[in-house]
A protein has these predicted regions:
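Short, Lys/Arg-enriched, disordered terminal segments
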Residues: 1-3, 188
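Short linear clamp-binding motif
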Residues: 3-11
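Residue-level detector of conserved, function-critical positions
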Residues: 16-187
Length: 188
């Protein structure tokens, strides 16, 4: 916490994160179209149903009584910036997928996973499997492959390990988690 945050607290001023926490703990956010999910370590996510899918919108930190808008109503990431993406790992991907990452589009199946040692994996699908485009009669399917990139966030919704394409080498996630845990531990 910065000195300015400490002074604001002493003066009784709430931060935006503290105000959002209070709002998200009202009855409105305890029923549809919202859904509360526990992520462990005093953390939770509030999802919102959009176009028939649950989307992770808000990250809740019960330990600090703060909340963060992770994704906005337009399904764009709020706490992630272009600097939080390992662009080198995306260079051989289709241009449409790279464009979605550049636009910070969180439109497809993407999730904040459980917290462990102060960090959580985020899986961000930047290109869906071709079946995504198929209608009820089976028409419209494309030959697209599902593409997910992965990153790690801390309990303040900040990226600590950049999002990158791991080319389905899931052992890489263990390395990324260890790196994220070290970064968070070194801040304490």
């Amino acid at each position: 916490m910065s000195i300015y945050d400490k002074i604001s607290k002493m003066l009784g001023h709430e931060s935006d994160a503290e105000k959002l926490y209070k709002v998200l703990n009202t009855d409105e956010y305890k029923e549809r179209p919202y859904e509360y999910s526990d992520l462990g370590e005093g953390m939770a996510v509030i999802g919102e149903t959009m176009w028939g899918w649950w989307k992770h919108r808000f990250l809740i930190n019960h330990n600090t009584k703060c909340a963060y808008e992770f994704m906005d109503k337009d399904q764009r990431l709020v706490t992630v910036t272009e600097d939080d993406i390992d662009w080198e790992s995306l260079k051989n991907l289709p241009e449409d997928a790279i464009g979605r990452a550049r636009a910070l589009s969180f439109h497809f199946h993407s999730f904040i996973r459980h917290f462990e040692n102060g960090v959580a994996e985020v899986s961000w699908q930047i290109n869906p499997d071709g079946r995504y485009y198929m209608d009820d009669d089976g028409f419209g399917m494309t030959d697209d492959d599902e593409i997910e990139i992965y990153g790690f966030i801390d309990q303040n919704a900040k990226v600590v390990v950049k999002f990158k394409n791991i080319n389905e080498h899931y052992g890489e996630l263990d390395k990324m988690r260890k790196e994220a845990e070290q970064i968070v531990k070194s801040r304490q």
